[in-house]
Curated annotation (Swiss-Prot):
Any single Pfam family the record assigns to this protein: RRM_1
Basic and acidic residues biased stretches: 49-61, 88-97
Keywords recorded for this protein, A-Z: Chromosome, Nucleus, Repressor, RNA-binding, Transcription, Transcription regulation
GO biological process, any: negative regulation of transcription elongation by RNA polymerase II
Chain positions covered by the region annotation Disordered: 25-109
UniProt keyword Chaperone present: no
Ranges of biased composition (kind: Polar residues): 73-84, 98-109
Encoding gene (name): Nelf-E
Species, as recorded: Drosophila virilis (Fruit fly)
Compositionally biased intervals (Basic residues): 25-36
Protein name (Swiss-Prot/TrEMBL): Negative elongation factor E
Amino acid sequence: MVYIHFPNNLTEEEHMLQAKYQKLKKKKKALQAHKAPKQEPESALTLKRPTDARDAREVARKLIKSGAIPAIQKQQTKQDQTSFKRPKGQERAKRSTSETTVAAYQPFSSTQNDVAQETIISEIIKEEPRRQNLYQHFATERVREERGLTEKVTLDTTQPEKPRAGNTIFVSGNKVTEEFLKKTFNDYGTIVNVSMEIEKSRGFVSFAKPESADRAIAEMHGKSVTGIVLQVQLARRQPQIVPINDASSSAVWSSIAASKSQKGSHKDLRQMVQYNDDFLM
């Protein structure tokens, strides 16, 4: 192992270096103190009274922003604390009445104002129960929906409509003719009339009895006859058809015919005039 021994006393060179270092240290401190900016003493703010009100307002605003002076807070009076907000409905009614007033001489304006205020108050009182009823209605509906009790009750006060009946049927098909309709529907009953709409390929067949029309609709609707699919329905407009072969009508006409002879009871009182052949020549 190697031991190094440092003497307690400094040599001359070390003393010179130490003195030099102390001088440099003092110079450095003096240079830093010279370069550092000097702090100027704060000057007291001298408030000058501005000549204009606008300038005073600007100065006060700047001072409040800088925090030099606090903002003045308005003290609430007892009347402000006990005041209440006017209802919206009353404000709306008051605005509408003020807009509708006419600038003219009104000798009874004070009484009219009292009446208007009374009407406004009565309207507000009427609106409150209506709002409560609406709220109750929506609340009950919501409860019923949550519980699953939404049931729509339909009360049919009207009587059930009677089934339609008639003698005339509506027939439509591709290239339908009058002869085709007579031939096809002749088996269901006596045909009174057949009317055609040739451009639209449809027609109307009138039977003597409604039963024949019902049977034709039941059997021929949607049926194909000679390659033509027929659409048979009851006609919307039913013409009034008087039955021809009715027993009562035939009896009436037979009695009238029996009472009257074919020649009649009138006697001809005229004399026959005869002409000769020479006169004709």
